[in-house]
């Protein structure tokens, strides 16, 4: 392998590593976002359940 090929190969490997790093960062962000969405959804479900319970309590009192 001559010097020019080695330079191209090295550049390709460095670029691949950079892309892999970016992908790992994006997956980490995706996991964080997914976790936040799940937390928000759970909170919403709890609010919805308590609202439904409050409505049924109010309706049965009437």
From Swiss-Prot:
Determine the domain of life of the protein's source: Eukaryota
Any idea which UniProt keywords this protein has? Coiled coil
- Coiled-coil-forming residues are 14-49
Q: What is this protein called?
A: Coiled-coil domain-containing protein YLR146W-A
Q: Which organism is it from?
A: Saccharomyces cerevisiae (strain ATCC 204508 / S288c)
Q: What is the lineage of its organism?
A: Eukaryota, Fungi, Dikarya, Ascomycota, Saccharomycotina
